[in-house]
């Protein structure tokens, strides 16, 4: 037999930890969906700003944007 049950060692349920107690409120909304679009527009704006930020960093790295007074060695 592959599994074996030991007498008197029944599991009483999940263990409670301090970390679990602290994170419990973050999981209390699990399965609930905000009506309508929710925060989708905010996420779209955040993604657009992040893409602009990355393109600025790339342009600086490629020296396609010249910065006055800063020497690139």
From Swiss-Prot:
Biased composition (Polar residues): 1-12
PTM-bearing positions, type Phosphothreonine: 3, 5
Cell compartment(s), UniProt: Plastid, Chloroplast thylakoid membrane
Taxonomic superkingdom: Eukaryota
Signal peptide: none
Residue ranges, annotated region (Disordered): 1-20
Membrane topology of this protein: Single-pass membrane protein
SUPFAM superfamilies on file: Photosystem II 10 kDa phosphoprotein PsbH (SSF161025)
Alphabetic keyword roster: Chloroplast, Membrane, Phosphoprotein, Photosynthesis, Photosystem II, Plastid, Thylakoid, Transmembrane, Transmembrane helix
One GO cellular component term noted in the UniProt record for this chain: photosystem II
Keyword Translocase tagged: no
Pfam families recorded: PsbH (PF00737)
Listed transmembrane segments: 41-61
Annotated GO biological process: photosynthesis; protein stabilization
Matching Gene3D superfamilies: Photosystem II reaction center protein H (1.20.5.880)
Molecular functions per Gene Ontology: phosphate ion binding
Modifications after synthesis and translation: Phosphorylation is a light-dependent reaction catalyzed by a membrane-bound kinase; phosphorylation occurs on Thr residue(s) in the N-terminus of the protein.
NCBIfam families for this protein: PRK02624.1
Described purpose of this protein according to its UniProt entry: One of the components of the core complex of photosystem II (PSII), required for its stability and/or assembly. PSII is a light-driven water:plastoquinone oxidoreductase that uses light energy to abstract electrons from H(2)O, generating O(2) and a proton gradient subsequently used for ATP formation. It consists of a core antenna complex that captures photons, and an electron transfer chain that converts photonic excitation into a charge separation.
Subunit structure: PSII is composed of 1 copy each of membrane proteins PsbA, PsbB, PsbC, PsbD, PsbE, PsbF, PsbH, PsbI, PsbJ, PsbK, PsbL, PsbM, PsbT, PsbX, PsbY, PsbZ, Psb30/Ycf12, at least 3 peripheral proteins of the oxygen-evolving complex and a large number of cofactors. It forms dimeric complexes.
Family per record: Belongs to the PsbH family.
HAMAP family, alphabetized: PSII_PsbH
Protein name in the entry: Photosystem II reaction center protein H
């Amino acid at each position: 037999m592959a599994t074996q049950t030991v007498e008197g060692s029944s599991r009483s349920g999940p263990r409670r930890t301090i970390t679990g107690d602290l994170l419990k409120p973050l999981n209390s909304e699990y399965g609930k969906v905000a009506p309508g679009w929710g925060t989708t527009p905010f996420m779209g704006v955040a993604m657009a700003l992040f893409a602009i930020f990355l393109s600025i960093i790339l342009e600086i790295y490629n020296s396609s944007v010249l910065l006055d007074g800063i020497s690139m060695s």
